[in-house]
Amino acid sequence: EKIVELAKKDAKNNIYMGNEFMNLRKAEVAKVAPNRAALIGKFNQSMSSGNMGDMKEIQEADKRWLCILFGIPYEAEYQGEGTGSAIHIYNEGGEEVLTYTQGVGWHEKETKAETGVHSALKSAYYEAYHDARKALNNGTNVEITNENVVVQSNFDMKA
């Protein structure tokens, strides 16, 4: 219902996916997203504490230590050598959520759950926005009641 309201409001203002919708979408995706900031924080804290001085030490760390560092249900894997080395962090479903490389730093990977929320919200918004724009272009008012869209004509019988 909130998405339909925002789409209708944006359609009236001739804005597609305005700030309010984007903020709502971000908040909804955050509900299913892994806490990447905490994962990055744990890694950075470990690197700066002197426990792990460089990627070579990470390479030598066993999988158990990497899992302890990032916490259950996350798993980590070190891959490669030299400048092409990377650490990959996986969620409980085996989906990669973060990658760290020395030259680039952190790179976030979207999970299937996050993609699903994005898709559902964008699809619902698109349909509601399209219906509202169509009604506006046809010179009708759109009234939202529950999840149904009721179209009322602006035709004036007295004119």
Explain the meaning of each model-derived region.
Residues E1-A159:
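Type III/flagellar secretion export determinants
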